[in-house]
Amino acid sequence: MMPMDTVREYLLWNDFLRVCGIDEAGRGPLAGPVVAAAVVFPRWFSPDEGILRRLNDSKKLTPSLRRELAPAIREEAECWAVEAVDHETIDRINILRATMLAMNRAAESLPRQPDLLLIDGNRFTPNIPVPYQTIVGGDALVFSIAAASVLAKTERDRMMEEYAERYPEYGFERNAGYGTREHVEAIRRHGRSPIHRTSFRLRQLGEK
């Protein structure tokens, strides 16, 4: 993988002081929350050396590298925030709205309001009066979005590992709630746990 840099942010820093990357983790799983993170790096920041030179879209990184990157991101960022929306809310308002809610909560939780939001994906509904840009594949293109993707993913993985201790039969520490063959078979044998999303139907189990 080619190392990422703050090229996109440099262009924007001419006009915006605090450029905030936002991404989520957990839209697709059958269980657990959706988690979003917001990250603002200092103006003119560049990852010249160290572990942040290895930053990329969290899906392209190993779990161990994500765990190394997360504290470095928190240390180098001007400010950051992580917010989760639980499975019950997902079932009540749907996963798209829950994802928007998590992203907005992350942006609102920052100790200093950003001047521009960079959102991974192609849609966003803001709750705060801040301009934004949506960027398809932004977690592989924009440094601050990639950083947000790592914080969101590592926090969600941590939460699912805690759930695995309460519901060990589902293997959440391995599948993070995603619909792996092992996970679907566990649902077939044991039924859904209290943290499963009831609005997500399983064709493998004949659900429609």
From Swiss-Prot:
It catalyses: Endonucleolytic cleavage to 5'-phosphomonoester. Its cofactor is Mn(2+); Mg(2+). The keyword Hydrolase applies. Its EC number is 3.1.26.4. One of its GO terms (cellular component) is ribonuclease H2 complex. Keywords: Cytoplasm, Endonuclease, Hydrolase, Manganese, Metal-binding, Nuclease. It is an enzyme of class 3 (hydrolase). A divalent metal cation binds at D23, E24, D120. It is found in: Cytoplasm. Endonuclease that specifically degrades the RNA of RNA-DNA hybrids. Belongs to the RNase HII family. HAMAP family: RNase_HII_B (MF_00052_B). This is Ribonuclease HII. It comes from Chlorobium luteolum (strain DSM 273 / BCRC 81028 / 2530) (Pelodictyon luteolum).
